Amino acid sequence: MAMSLLGITFGIAFFVVTQAQTSGFEAFFIRTILGTNGAIKVSDRFQDMDGTVSRTDQDGKTRFSFRSREESRYTEGIETPHLLRKALSQFKGITGISEILEGNAILDGGSRSYAISFHGIRINDHISVSDLGNQIIIGDLSSFESDKMSVLIGSRIAQRLMISQGDRVTLKGGTGNIQLRVAGMFESGVSQIDKNRIYLHLAKAREFKGERFSGSIFQVGIQNPNVAPQIAAQMQETLGHRVVSWQEREKVWLDVFKALRVSSAITVSSILLLSGLGIFNVFAIMVIEKTRDIAILRSMGFSGSDASAVFLWQGIIVLIFGIIAGTLLGILAT
């Protein structure tokens, strides 16, 4: 009986631990992604702006036809960011909008060079749609905000180039080279970002890339990230731009977490099944050993169902205590 109780206890505890661990990793991943790349991204414009076409028939009625944009071509970037920003602000649930100009360049730290991806941002807008303010590990945002020739670099980039706060670096490529001062380092928790991304001011990024107005994208923050797919679909249909929610962008990783939860549940269920078989064997042997006692109970007027109930209640009590003990053990372990 004790072995059966231990089997249930450790089976439930293992289930709680594995599910909590997977859920914790998933929550951390989602929090990191939302704090870095935002809930929604608005980018390229559809070339066919006739996604919805209205026509007036001979009877005077206006009818609408909808064309699928699945095979549509795109015009790279946003051509009129100020107008699109105004349109985005009209949607409900929007908490912030940040215009970003992306590009690739070479960052020269003096003794070493490294290929990076730069994001031109307006810092006050960007901290409203990201967690950049809490990701700074060296330096501060006020220093970056006050110096238009400054840059924030990923922690992995700083390690590879062996540069520190206040050092001068050169951004090479685009229309030429520009000298920047390192205002700070950030650590997002995503190694791919920390070893490839830098932030500089949007105006300086436009000057470096040679694009005065167009070519940027928008990162949008919303109150409830869980409804991002619905809001993204509304934006795409209304604005005629490619709009991607974080669920669509990170679908592969979210599917991985689902698979991990299912696999761990199957594993633990197998353990519990074995524990159940153990309980069955224990009670089968117990019934055989208690044959004389059962006969005495029957002679005293107890029915067969009454005698069976004694053993069933023993099994239920073992199960309940095992579940409670396993749950508490799992909570303590996590």
Task: Please provide the spans of the model-predicted regions.
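Short acidic/glycine-enriched loop/turn elements at secondary-structure junctions
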Residues: 73-181, 207-208
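Transmembrane alpha-helical interface segments in multi-pass membrane proteins
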Residues: 284, 292-334
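Peri-transmembrane interface segments
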Residues: 1, 224, 229-280, 286-288, ...
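Short, strongly hydrophobic transmembrane alpha-helices
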Residues: 1-24, 33
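Membrane-spanning helices that line or support transport/gating and their immediate boundary helices
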Residues: 20-28, 32, 283-286, 327, ...
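Hydrophobic, regular-secondary-structure patches
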Residues: 19-115
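Alpha-helical transmembrane segments of integral membrane proteins
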Residues: 4-14, 261-281, 315-326
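Basic-flanked hydrophobic alpha-helices used for secretion and membrane insertion
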Residues: 119-122, 140, 152-242
